UniProtKB/Swiss-Prot annotation:
Catalyzes the deamination of dCTP to dUTP. One of its GO terms (molecular function) is dCTP deaminase activity. InterPro entries: dCTP_deaminase (IPR011962), dUTPase-like_sf (IPR036157), dUTPase_trimeric (IPR033704). It catalyses: dCTP + H2O + H(+) = dUTP + NH4(+). It is an enzyme of class 3 (hydrolase). It comes from Saccharolobus solfataricus (strain ATCC 35092 / DSM 1617 / JCM 11322 / P2). Homotrimer. This is dCTP deaminase.
Amino acid sequence: MILSDRDLKYYLEKSWIKIQPLREDTIRENGVDLRVGNEIARFKKTDKIFDPDNPDPSFFQTEKGEEFIIQPYEHVLLTTEEYIELNNDVMAFVNLRSTFARLGLFIPPTIVDAGFKGQVTIEVVGSSFPVKLKRSTRFIHLIFARTLTPVEYPYQGKYQGQKGVTLPKFNSQISSFYYQHQSI
């Protein structure tokens, strides 16, 4: 079941969904808008090979600021201003607000799992021309859905509790939680 604005207000009142800071214009008809945070990570152009078994953070350049220029076809990681917490029976689909999609910006399909807590880090792919993003601009839209029952294993993954832009985490950094709960 997709949550409407009324449902969202009720879930927020009951603390089944938490969003900090929560502004008046955040809650929309069938979802919540989240804002551009104060940090991005740019993917560096290189011929060097990235090895997931031996991750090297030098492939990224992290920046803090009040505004960011996304260059043509550039890939960046962006964080939201808001910190969210989802109950064990609530998940969210992340979409780019249509105004930015109409500029040619793109984000891949992304899900926020039931039980997640943290700021959302999202990949953004640039348009065919530079686009300026300012901190606190409503940028992504979360559509919340309630699961029929609470999930058996709420999200406890490697990005739980993340604050700021979070670079990818691989094998040696992955919690064994997921593997402990797989059927054989």
